[in-house]
UniProtKB/Swiss-Prot annotation:
UniProt-annotated location(s): Secreted
Reaction equations catalysed: Hydrolysis of terminal, non-reducing alpha-D-galactose residues in alpha-D-galactosides, including galactose oligosaccharides, galactomannans and galactolipids
Principal location class: secreted
Keyword Glycoprotein on entry: yes
Residues holding substrate: 73-74, 148, 206, 252
Gene Ontology, cellular component aspect: extracellular region
Enzyme Commission code: 3.2.1.22
Organism from which the protein derives: Torulaspora delbrueckii (Yeast)
GO terms, biological process: melibiose catabolic process
Lineage: Eukaryota, Fungi, Dikarya, Ascomycota, Saccharomycotina
Family the entry assigns: Belongs to the glycosyl hydrolase 27 family.
Subunit-level organization: Homotetramer.
Keywords recorded for this protein, A-Z: Disulfide bond, Glycoprotein, Glycosidase, Hydrolase, Secreted, Signal
Name this polypeptide is given: Alpha-galactosidase
Disulfide bonds: 43-75, 122-152, 222-238, 224-231
Amino acid sequence: MINFSLLTSIVLLASKVVGVSPSYNGLGLTPQMGWNNWNTFACNVSEDLLLSTVDRIAALGLRDIGYHYVILDDCWSDGRDSDGMLVPDSTKFPNGMKHVADYLHGKDFLFGMYSSAGEYTCAGYAGSLDHEEDDAAFFAKNEVDYLKYDNCYNRGQFGTPETSFNRYRAMSEALNKTERPIFYSLCNWGQDLTFYWGSGIANSWRISGDITAEFDRPDSRCPCDGDEYDCPYAGFHCSIMNILNKAAPMGQNAGVGGWNDLDCLEVGVGNLTDDEEKAHFSMWAIVKSAMVIGADVRNLKPSSFSIYSQASVLAINQDPAGAPAIRVWRRYVPETDQHGQGEVQLWSGPLDNGDRVVALLNGGAKERPMVAYLEDIFIDSFVGSEELSSTWNVYDLWANRIDDSTASQILVGNRTANGLLYNATQLSYADGLKANDTRLFGEKVGTIEPYGLLNVTVPAHGVGLFRLRRESRK
């Protein structure tokens, strides 16, 4: 049944944000990459944690591969002073936030901070509702480059798209007023159809409740399943597949300057298998989600480090076209896992240079052969089209992954990442793709003939991820 009241609110809201957005800031031309402390450390934050993490990210080559934002989440403040200005916790941050920003900037990182569009933050600290201009000035004064803006204790100011839009627009306008470029990342859990209005005021927006390090485990704390993209109660402890399925219809509302954020990466967090971590990283990359590390980078295992440093996958995420892949089909399979879950999916999306990304995702409990036909990969093409009548070379985007032995040597300091990992600081992903840098294209593993198919074997809870390149005609 169509909710005409809700539809009317959306139409009215859209009419207000058509054209040049007042919050457009020139940021977010590709999805943000970085690190956030929450998934591993929660409220256990400090100056030492941030600075030691920065040093580690740089030493491992992860900064140069693209992880530039270091984002301090909740629990950093000690309330407000007599003038109503935010005060950092002097025990956790004895030198203040400007000192942290200076250190990060000196190491060629960007500094992110956190607040909430509510009376309090989610952990009960001072929120920014009705303090937007003062708090934006605080962030600008401390040379913050990124704001994650949460949704807790919002005084009931939600329920329609326009209500939530107005609450989040207040901080957007306050940030712009400072004239400092600050990436604005909404964290309202997809409430009130954020994907319809987020791009008018922000650079990214969360689409669901908080992620947990589970591949496809139902949890009553994340009450909406993956078919409910407009979830009235987002909750938390949402699995990877739950969030991915919620994201499936939303790609049409994201692009250059404004991205769907599927939450931080759980690679290296919890007990996901290697195939699950690869699938998680791959799917976040192709839907053009934020790629924000949620693990303790000071204690990464080799396999997780090699996933975070896989440039051929990151090149899909950072592709200048900014076109999220779409889910072409989704089918349930009888081989369910211990949680009763089992499905397979095909995803496909265009890339800037005419290539195509293809993902065959196996959410079932057993390894299985999977097939993708060209007419499904190019779902919008017609019989006789150039796409269907061409020959395509198939490149495996995980084939050139660094091995655990090499990753271990880098992690213990016996080998440098320089010259081994891709350096997007020296050569951007856009320029590397133009230059046909082989590190960004994977390894050729086959060919699809005109009107043909891709046939691969995909492990349980795993993915086959490929770049298709049109074969040159003689």
